């Protein structure tokens, strides 16, 4: 399973990249605003800065909600860097734009997916990635991981090449369970990656090794 980090924070991206396990980055307008990145030129430059840190795909989301606007913004984003994946909303216009881009060899990520039917439409439109939001489904007492399983079954039934990008990942068990189910990619905060390093028995074992070493070298 590929590991993406869901942030626009360059320091966090660099920290994840330094681990040697990062495969890409996902962003959205909210994450850009959180980092104080505003204005078209600044936003576009920030995407390039991210691409210069990582070697993998970088999802850059359109702001337009109309078809023509999505096409215009998506083409501009795709021209920025060959690592850019155009991120589109799961709407009628978004699916139409996804088909337009896929027919022209431009990679896409259809986001805000909350049902297997939406994921099926994204695959039919040729999306490179579909992004089901598991954490937000959990928030309303729905099983987000079950949606990943449903999408996996559908995609396997028909041989769709669209990759399942598990989004709204909140914690390490989301990561592990997505891997068990067969998600192609997970994207989450830095904490969801760093958290995989930790286990109390590992900490106890390391402390014991250090104590034994120091005892034997007094």
Curated annotation (Swiss-Prot):
Report which superkingdom the organism of origin falls in: Bacteria
What pathway, per the record?
A: Carbohydrate degradation; pentose phosphate pathway; D-glyceraldehyde 3-phosphate and beta-D-fructose 6-phosphate from D-ribose 5-phosphate and D-xylulose 5-phosphate (non-oxidative stage): step 2/3
Q: Name one GO molecular function term.
A: transaldolase activity
Q: Where in the cell is it found?
A: Cytoplasm
Which coarse location class applies to the principal site listed for this UniProt protein?
cytoplasm
Stored Gene3D superfamilies? Aldolase class I
Under Enzyme Commission nomenclature, its number is: 2.2.1.2
Give, as one word, the top-level EC class.
transferase
Catalytic activity reported: D-sedoheptulose 7-phosphate + D-glyceraldehyde 3-phosphate = D-erythrose 4-phosphate + beta-D-fructose 6-phosphate
Question: Per the record, what is one GO cellular component?
Answer: cytoplasm
Q: Which Pfam families match?
A: TAL_FSA
Protein's UniProt keywords contain Transferase: yes
Q: What does this protein do?
A: Transaldolase is important for the balance of metabolites in the pentose-phosphate pathway.
Q: Which family does it belong to?
A: Belongs to the transaldolase family. Type 3B subfamily.
Instruction: Give the protein's recorded name.
Output: Probable transaldolase
Q: Gene for this protein?
A: tal
């Amino acid at each position: 399973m590929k590991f993406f980090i869901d942030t626009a924070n360059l320091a966090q991206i660099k920290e994840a990249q330094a681990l040697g396990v990062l495969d890409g980055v996902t962003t959205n307008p909210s994450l850009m605003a959180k980092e104080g990145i505003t204005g078209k030129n600044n936003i576009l430059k920030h995407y390039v800065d991210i691409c210069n840190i990582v070697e993998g795909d970088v999802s850059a989301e359109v702001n337009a909600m109309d078809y023509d606007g999505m096409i215009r913004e998506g083409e501009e984003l795709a021209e920025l860097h060959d690592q850019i994946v155009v991120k589109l909303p799961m709407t009628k216009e978004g699916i139409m734009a996804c088909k337009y881009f896929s027919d022209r060899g431009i990679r896409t990520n259809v986001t805000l997916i909350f049902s297997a039917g939406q994921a099926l439409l994204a695959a039919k439109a040729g999306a490179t990635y579909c992004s089901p939001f598991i954490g937000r489904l959990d928030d309303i007492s729905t099983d987000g991981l079950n949606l990943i399983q449903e999408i996996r079954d559908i995609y396997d039934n028909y041989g769709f090449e669209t990759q399942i990008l598990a989004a709204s990942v909140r914690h390490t068990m989301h990561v592990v369970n997505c891997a068990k189910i067969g998600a192609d990619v997970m994207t989450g905060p830095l904490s969801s990656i760093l958290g995989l390093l930790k286990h109390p028995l590992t900490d106890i074992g390391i402390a014991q090794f250090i104590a034994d070493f120091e005892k034997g070298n007094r």
